[in-house]
């Protein structure tokens, strides 16, 4: 691993329909093999589906879902004197967002609906209402951190 300099962050343009940077990041995370148009169709289709079902602003619902899934604290392994401890640490804001996006997508992929649009819209609605597997994942991570609070003095 090179120690010369840290890779600079790439500039991400907001998405064309809603003008939102987070939706663009979400789209990029869904994209496979550089097929951005397919990812756009999935994300916009899911947001349109959510708008029809809930009759609310889909962007607000999307942000609420992300906020409900984002972890505030997580555990990292730390080796101290031959023993490995799970040390709870706070999550940086950019990592919080990245984890929330990743967990939402993996939870949507694990659902039983037929198309990815249906799966994603269902998971977004569930996450916005504090239900679903993505929220369960966040609660599991928080529970793990709470259980290992005794090792928080090993923080670095």
From Swiss-Prot:
One of its GO terms (molecular function) is structural constituent of ribosome. GO terms for cellular component: small ribosomal subunit. SUPFAM superfamilies: Ribosomal protein S7. InterPro entries: Ribosomal_uS7, Ribosomal_uS7_bac/org-type, Ribosomal_uS7_CS, Ribosomal_uS7_dom, Ribosomal_uS7_dom_sf. One of its GO terms (biological process) is translation. It comes from the Bacteria. Keywords: Ribonucleoprotein, Ribosomal protein, RNA-binding, rRNA-binding, tRNA-binding. Pfam families: Ribosomal_S7 (PF00177). CDD domains: uS7_Bacteria. The keyword rRNA-binding applies. Belongs to the universal ribosomal protein uS7 family. NCBIfam families: rpsG_bact (TIGR01029). Part of the 30S ribosomal subunit. Contacts proteins S9 and S11. One of the primary rRNA binding proteins, it binds directly to 16S rRNA where it nucleates assembly of the head domain of the 30S subunit. Is located at the subunit interface close to the decoding center, probably blocks exit of the E-site tRNA. This is Small ribosomal subunit protein uS7. It comes from Bartonella tribocorum (strain CIP 105476 / IBS 506).
